[in-house]
């Protein structure tokens, strides 16, 4: 029973550790994002080197780059639209859950 009521110092330590854990999780996510970004850059350069051949004109290379840029911009647009659709669905589910919770709270106890 000695540890049943945490001391103020225990609570402070818990909060400190919890905040540190959250900070480390954010740092992990940031590093993972940097890894993904750099892997994508490597892949982009690999793709570019597949298209560029010796003796190509500067204009041909610029055309390839413009085409790749357009493709990536289209993908970004598609992801923005997909993200908006997912966010809309998430908001709708949140509203439904909130409404269900409010109904449950206001129900008389005998009807359950």
Curated annotation (Swiss-Prot):
GO cellular component labels: cytosol
Listed InterPro entries: DUF496, UPF0265
Subcellular location: Cytoplasm
One Pfam family here: DUF496
Main localization, broad class: cytoplasm
Keyword set includes Kinase: no
Keywords: Coiled coil, Cytoplasm
Cytoplasm in keyword set: yes
Coiled coil, from the record: 14-41
Assigned protein family: Belongs to the pole-localizer TmaR family.
Purpose: Pole-localizer protein involved in the regulation of several cellular processes.
HAMAP family (UniProt xref): Pole_loc_TmaR (MF_00683)
UniProt-recorded name of the protein: Pole-localizer protein TmaR
Gene name tied to this protein: tmaR
């Amino acid at each position: 029973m000695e540890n049943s009521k945490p001391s103020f110092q225990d609570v402070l330590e818990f909060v400190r550790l919890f905040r540190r854990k959250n900070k480390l999780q954010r740092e992990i996510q940031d590093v993972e994002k940097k890894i993904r970004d750099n892997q994508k850059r490597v892949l982009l350069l690999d793709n570019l080197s597949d298209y560029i051949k010796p003796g190509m004109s500067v204009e041909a290379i610029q055309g390839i780059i413009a085409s790749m840029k357009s493709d990536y911009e289209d993908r970004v647009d598609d992801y923005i639209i997909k993200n908006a659709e997912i966010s809309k669905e998430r908001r709708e589910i949140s509203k439904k859950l909130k409404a269900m919770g409010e109904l449950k709270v206001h129900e008389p106890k005998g009807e359950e």
